[in-house]
From Swiss-Prot:
Assembly information from the UniProt record: Composed of six subunits; NqrA, NqrB, NqrC, NqrD, NqrE and NqrF.
Provenance organism: Vibrio vulnificus (strain YJ016)
Residue intervals passing through the bilayer: 42-62, 72-92, 103-123, 131-151, 178-198
Protein name: Na(+)-translocating NADH-quinone reductase subunit D
Record has Ligase as a keyword: no
Top-level taxonomy: Bacteria, Pseudomonadati, Pseudomonadota, Gammaproteobacteria, Vibrionales
InterPro entries: NqrD, NqrDE/RnfAE
Amino acid sequence: MSSAQNIKKSILAPVLDNNPIALQVLGVCSALAVTTKLETAFVMTLAVTFVTALSNFFVSVIRNHIPNSVRIIVQMAIIASLVIVVDQILKAYLYDISKQLSVFVGLIITNCIVMGRAEAFAMKSAPVPSLIDGIGNGLGYGFVLITVGFFRELFGSGKLFGMEVLPLVNNGGWYQPNGLMLLAPSAFFLIGFMIWAIRTFKPEQVEAKE
C-alpha cells in the first residue's frame, strides 16, 4: 500500500469504519455536554484534534526513552501541557466559547480517545504516522460531535451557528423550538441513531451473538 493510501486510510477510517464514539464508545461525556450548539461542537472538535495529533506525535518521538513504569504519567503530562495551551488560546481569542465549554476543555486530559491513541498507537509507531492517526481520530470524534450538534441546535433552537434558520414563532414564524433537543438525553438518542445507521450500512461492525 502506498504512502498516500496509508495517510488516506488513517484519516478516513476513524470516521465510519472505526469511529471512536460510534464503534469504540469513547468520549461520550463531552459529546453530550458540548453539542447543544454547532459552534461549541466545532471548536471542541478542533481542540481534541489538536491535542490528539500533537500528543501522539510527541509521545512517539520520545517513546524509546520512556521507562515502561512511568509511560502513562509521561503521556498525561504531554496531554495536559497541550490542553493548557488550547485552554489559554480559547480564553484569549474565543472567550465566550471558552465559557460555554467550561470544564470540558480541561477534561480533554482524561478523554479516553486521546489517552487510548497515545498508548495503543503512538507508543508503537513512528512520529508522522502517529500525527496522522491523531488527526484521523480527532476528525472521527468531530464527525459525531458536529452531526449531533447540527440536529440539536437546528431543532432545539431553530438556529445554526447562532443564526436563525427556521422562522421562530417568537419572531412571527412557524417553528416552535423543541426544548428536549437541548437536554442531554437527546444526544444519547442521536448518537444511538448514528450507530444504528452506520451499522446498517456496515454490518461487519455488528457484534456477533453469544
